[in-house]
């Protein structure tokens, strides 16, 4: 995608539409699956009641004991999966200095063997339900890892074979757009490509969704 008005915008860049309404009140609903590219996104609530939107895959947190992951708690089981999503651990290492408290975010160093014997943990998802509406029932630790300074960030991402799984939106989870509020816009240097889902309490609540690749 080239910037509008630039000399390199020499082909069509259409705006795609995924407008809709809540099919069944009180039930999460997928709006868009994960996409290879997305340069613009607009979401707007045009109904008379609040709507909640969620982005990306399921979510979980890790607990640490003596430098190793001791347990993983699923905080958002996700929905609409046909394949188990992938679990990755980000950050949590000493970053070459045992005085460092660790950074439990993507981009933070993981444990390694440079100053203490360390290795990154491994885990996999156990699913419940039937495809295409699987959700995560638990996460099994295959390798507890070693040498963590702080519990790492648990990053759950959809399988390459399944772009349709998404975090569950609800009245207590997700981005709230109030009735007839201003649109949520992403336009410029970055726009996520994650799956997007919506939740509304009442059947028929309408929303707008427009995007560009």
Model-derived regions, located:
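Noncatalytic modules at the cell exterior or secretory-pathway interfaces
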Residues: 39-41, 188-205
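Conserved, function-critical positions that sit in or immediately flank catalytic
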Residues: 57-173
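Short, flexible beta-strand-to-coil junctions
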Residues: 43-50, 55-56, 157-161, 198-203, ...
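Short proline/glycine-enriched turn/loop motifs at strand-loop junctions of beta-rich domains
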Residues: 35-38, 45-50, 79-82, 148-149, ...
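Beta-rich globular "head" domains
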Residues: 19, 25-56, 210
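Beta-sandwich interaction modules
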Residues: 30-33, 172-193
């Amino acid at each position: 995608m080239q910037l509008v008005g630039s000399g390199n915008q020499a082909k069509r860049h259409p705006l795609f539409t995924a407008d809709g309404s809540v099919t069944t009140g009180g039930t999460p609903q997928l709006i868009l699956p994960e996409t290879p590219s997305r340069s613009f996104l607009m979401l707007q609530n045009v109904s008379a009641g609040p709507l909640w939107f969620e982005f990306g895959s399921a979510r979980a947190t890790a607990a640490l004991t003596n430098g190793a992951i001791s347990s993983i708690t699923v905080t958002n089981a996700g929905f609409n999966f046909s394949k188990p999503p992938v679990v990755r651990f980000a950050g949590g290492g000493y970053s070459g200095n045992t005085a460092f408290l660790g950074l439990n975010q993507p981009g933070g160093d993981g444990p390694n063997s440079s100053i203490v014997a360390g290795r990154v943990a491994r885990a996999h998802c156990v699913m419940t339900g039937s495809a295409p509406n699987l959700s995560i029932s638990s996460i099994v630790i295959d390798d507890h890892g070693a040498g963590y300074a702080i519990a790492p960030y648990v990053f759950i991402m959809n399988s390459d074979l399944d772009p349709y799984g998404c975090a569950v939106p609800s009245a207590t989870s997700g981005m709230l757009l109030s009735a007839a509020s201003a649109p949520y816009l992403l336009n410029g240097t970055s726009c996520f490509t994650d799956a997007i889902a919506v939740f509304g309490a009442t059947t028929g609540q309408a929303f707008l969704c427009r995007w560009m690749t």
